[in-house]
Regions:
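Non-catalytic signal-transmission and effector/linker regions of two-component phosphorelay proteins
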Residues: 1-8, 112-124
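A Lys-centered signature of the CheY-like receiver
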Residues: 107
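Receiver (REC) domain active-site loop signature in two-component systems and cognate sites
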Residues: 60
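Charged docking surfaces used in two-component/phosphorelay signaling
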Residues: 20-28
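Active-site residues of response regulator receiver
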Residues: 57
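Hydrophobic/aromatic residues positioned on beta-strands within the core alpha/beta folds
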Residues: 86-87
Length: 124
């Protein structure tokens, strides 16, 4: 990791089981996951702290993944290329700006694929 320090990854999903699974997978891979329960929570955490990568679900209450990406564009544009959008509806995500800005992973996904994507995004 980064000089022995675990890279911090924000994981935003409104499904507790998904957050827990992704968090455990990332922790086992040597990352330090930080959970957010929805898009608004993700925005608050992004404003309060720095992260090496971000994983967000596309469909969440209060603020969805699109809203989080728009917030990042306005406040931390350097984080866009470090953002992974998870979605059960990949066609919806690829039809707009997310296709060109963020890495998209379809649910369900292979955990090894997710870990590889996080490593790649954190290195950008």
């Amino acid at each position: 990791m980064d000089g022995g320090k675990a890279l911090r990854v924000l994981v935003a999903d409104d499904e507790p089981a998904i957050r827990t699974l992704v968090g455990r997978v990332l922790q086992r891979a040597g990352f330090q996951p930080v959970e957010a329960c929805d898009g608004q929570d993700a925005i608050e955490r992004l404003d309060a702290s720095d992260f090496d990568a971000v994983i967000i679900d596309l469909m969440m209450p209060r603020v969805d993944g699109y809203g989080v990406v728009e917030h990042l564009i306005g406040t931390k544009p350097e984080m866009i290329e470090k953002t992974i959008v998870m979605t059960a509806f990949p066609r919806a995500a690829t039809k707009d700006q997310l296709h060109h800005l963020c890495t998209i992973i379809s649910k369900p996904f292979e955990v090894n694929e997710l870990v590889a994507l996080v490593r790649d995004c954190a290195a950008r």
